[in-house]
Amino acid sequence: MKTRQRKRLFVSAALAVSLTMTVPMPASVNAAASDVTFTINTQSERAAISPNIYGTNQDLSGTENWSSRRLGGNRLTGYNWENNASSAGRDWLHYSDDFLCGNGGVPDTDCDKPGAVVTAFHDKSLENGAYSIVTLQMAGYVSRDKNGPVDESETAPSPRWDKVEFAKNAPFSLQPHLNDGQVYMDEEVNFLVNRYGNASTSTGIKAYSLDNEPALWSETHPRIHPEQLQAAELVAKSIDLSKAVKNVDPHAEIFGPALYGFGAYLSLQDAPGWPSLQGNYSWFIDYYLDQMKNAHTQNGKRLLDVLDVHWYPEAQGGGQRIVFGGAGNIDTQKARVQAPRSLWDPAYQEDSWIGTWFSSYLPLIPKLQSSIQTYYPGTKLAITESSYGGDNHISGGIATADALGIFGKYGVYAANYWQTEDNTDYTSAAYKLYRNYDGNKSGFGSIKVDAATSDTENSSVYASVTDEENSELHLIVLNKNFDDPINATFQLSGDKTYTSGRVWGFDQTGSDITEQAAITNINNNQFTYTLPPLSAYHIVLKADSTEPVNSDLVVQYKDGDRNNATDNQIKPHFNIQNKGTSPVDLSSLTLRYYFTKDSSAAMNGWIDWAKLGGSNIQISFGNHNGADSDTYAELGFSSGAGSIAEGGQSGEIQLRMSKADWSNFNEANDYSFDGAKTAYIDWDRVTLYQDGQLVWGIEP
């Protein structure tokens, strides 16, 4: 994909005719909303959710907490890792320049250093704990220089290009020869492995993509690959490049063939010679998978780990496609919120030439998975470019949130958003709903469980738990109706009784994620909640009580305010004991004290004294919905706090808190308060966490 809208060429007669057909509009979604029932079973359909589905090709606001990042797009087809030159191709006057340096935050002084674009990209992935997918070059040539437009007379081979060789077949160099006219892919991988370690290490690059959208090379990069790509050529290149990568880093995952869309899935964009190869294959994807499996057998190792496709829906409404045109009219917006159903729902038919002429290939994810199961079992599935348009409209936010839930529910391994509009506030909100709903990088659970809705047209629901204990249940619920609220009934089943819930979300009034009314009416694992029109909510349900794991850490407490429960300050004092046989790093611990503010004022906090040094303790405040508490104070410890020796203790920590307006508290109803405790005593109403896991106390 490029930064401007690409052309889609479909040269087969059937496709050409299909673009002129009048297609019936989908059924209206504006009927009055009825009551909806959501059923969730934490014991059914359990499976891990791949963390890589919350990925991107652009970083947007930087608050989305991306799980995977891809260095890809049309620019990467002509990228020269030796000097960081690249070609814009037809996207922008066939320019060869240093665009990728500026776009990737590489300083001008570093732009001539080998691999600078890739290392800057991966350094940022490491900084954010994200999985990296790096595109390698396979079309045949890359930019030799950064000297601007390349004339048609300078089409490769010419002095404006270096030839791509997959294997060097000679000793590697970390300072590649810049004037030999060759660029070696295995030498690039060796350069990266030398810098970061191989893919099995914590810092290594995990995945490489076999170029980008090869079916469009003759359209997007005619100076590099002017002839239309043939199916056998793509397979041969894929095998040879994958072998070269795996010979250097056998742990790396190979993504391919990065097909741009349905025309490529079907026939590699009517590739020359495809009819003679098709045989009994239902589409090109079957042929590609089968050939890569044969190569696996012949070479004794897997050469394709992840089937990689791109998906920009062709669905339309009101005469306008849902992507590449902003929010669109009201019918476009309605089509957009329904469009993710083409990923999974056999009962749905979208308004598009695909839905009209090739409906047997939809829904898409089951079709792709069927091809994998038939022709190359064990291959994973990725959608490394996608967008549902309307990035700054509620319809785009809801469609994106729906797609993310679908990716998790139906076993997609990796998925990466591609930015098609300047303002992406609602798309950003959709990702944050899963990955940073509270501003503290809290996210959807890692294990999906069974969730269903009684009304797939007007609503969606996705469910997950955070661990095998099912103590925290996460729900994403969407109201896709444009006019009416949904009166939702939630019916939960499983091995836990849930007693309270907090809710975050966004809606058509704004893209900011805000905390909504808490859930306090759960009775026998059933409750009701009203979802406004066009809204997306993340519900976090807590089980009856969260018990700490078996631990040698103990929190002692006393009231430092001598049972003065109605003044304008709270003064809890703490001591942390380590009864184990190994020291405990204090920086791995956080402590929480729960109370009621008795107002909406902001909170302030101070450490009056601490044996380990008040400057080594950080105070923060969070909202909480539980018994006798609406707020908690959290203490964190810096590395300067040191550790608690085996059999030792932290020493006294004196916390003092007040409201910004200095109004009085009523501590008598506070969960963690006990004015009778004037000397230190073990107190399980103050909680302690080690590396985020509860190790002492009982949460309210």
UniProtKB/Swiss-Prot annotation:
| Segment forming the signal sequence | 1-33
Q: Which keywords appear in this protein's UniProt record, sorted alphabetically?
A: Carbohydrate metabolism, Cellulose degradation, Glycosidase, Hydrolase, Polysaccharide degradation, Signal
Spell out the molecular function terms from Gene Ontology: cellulase activity; cellulose binding
Q: Which GO terms describe its biological process?
A: cellulose catabolic process
E.C. no: 3.2.1.4
- What does the UniProt PTM comment say about this protein? A short form (EG-A-S) arises from post-translational proteolysis of approximately 150 AA at the C-terminus of EG-A-L.
Ranges for the CBM3 domain? 550-700
Q: Which Gene3D superfamilies match?
A: Endoglucanase-like, Glycosidases, Golgi alpha-mannosidase II
Reaction equation(s) it catalyzes = Endohydrolysis of (1->4)-beta-D-glucosidic linkages in cellulose, lichenin and cereal beta-D-glucans
Question: Superkingdom of the source?
Answer: Bacteria
InterPro entries linked to this entry: CBM2/CBM3_carb-bd_dom_sf, CBM3, CBM3_sf, GH44_cat, Glyco_hydro_b, Glycoside_hydrolase_SF
Active site (UniProt): E213
Q: Which family does the similarity line name?
A: Belongs to the glycosyl hydrolase 44 (cellulase J) family.
Q: What name does this protein carry?
A: Endoglucanase A
Q: What species is given as this protein's source? A: Paenibacillus lautus (Bacillus lautus)
| Taxonomy of the source species | Bacteria, Bacillati, Bacillota, Bacilli, Bacillales
